[in-house]
Amino acid sequence: TRSRGLGDVYKRQVQDLKDEEVEGMIIDLRNNGGGSLVEAIEIAGLFIKSGPIVQVKERRGLQVLPDADPEISYEGPLIILVNRLSASASEILAAALQDYGRAIIVGDEHTHGKGTVQTLMSLGEKKGSLKLTTAGFYRINGGSTQLRGVRPDIIIPSLLDVMEIGEKELEHALPWTTIRPALYRKSNTIKECIPVLSAQSIDRRNTVSYTHLRAHETAYY
C-alpha cells in the first residue's frame, strides 16, 4: 500500500494467479507501515462484492469510504500475514477483510495500532511545520484501529512480542474508542475454520522440530 497505482497492479497479479488456478492466496503485510488509503480500499475491494471498507472521523463529521467496484477479483481462500510493524493503511486492509469474514488474519498478538491521520501545517519558512492529528480511522464494525490495532485470528509467537513496538508503548498515545458500526454483510464461510486452524497451529508449535527451530532463531538474533 505504499504507492499510487498499486491497486491496478495488484488486480492484474490476482488475475494471473487465478489463471494459474491457485488453491489460495497469502497477502504479506508484515513490516508494512502503510501508505495510500485509496489503494488500501481498492485492494480490499478485490476480495468483496461491494460495501464500506473504513470509517474516517474528523472535525466535519464521519465519512464511510466504500469499495465502489461490485466486481470480485478472487473468491478463494485468503490469508493475511501481519505483525506489530503493520500500520495505518495495512491495518485498514486487514481489519476490513477480517470484519467481512473474507480472510484469516495470522501473525503477532496485534498490529501497530496507528489509527489516526496527521496533517502538516506550515508555520512559515523560518518556523517550519506543525504536524497535527486531524482524523481517526474506524473499522466497519465500529472499533478503532488506534492503540489496539488488529488482533489476528491465529496468533503466532514472534520475537517482536518482547519489543516495545506499537502505539500502546507511547506515553501519550490516543485511546481506543468506538463508533456506530457501518452497514455491511459479513460472510460466515471461514468462521468454523478458525478454531480448527488455531488448534492445529498450537499443536505444531508444541512439536520438537518447532522448539528446535525457535531455539536456533533466538540464538541467531
Model regions: which residues?
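Active-site lining segments that contact anionic ligands and/or coordinate catalytic metals
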Residues: 75, 100, 127-132, 151, ...
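Single conserved hydrophobic/aromatic residue that forms the stacking wall/gate
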Residues: 1-10, 212-215, 219-221
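Conserved functional hotspot residues or short segments at active or partner-binding sites
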Residues: 145-217
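Short, well-ordered strand-loop elements centered on a beta-strand within folded domains, enriched
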Residues: 54, 60-62, 129-132, 145-147
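Polar, glycine-rich mid-to-C-terminal structural blocks
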Residues: 115-122, 128-141, 148-159
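Cleft-lining beta-strand/loop regions that shape enzyme active-site pockets
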Residues: 4-124, 136
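Residues in well-ordered beta-strands of folded domains
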Residues: 54, 106, 133-135, 155-157, ...
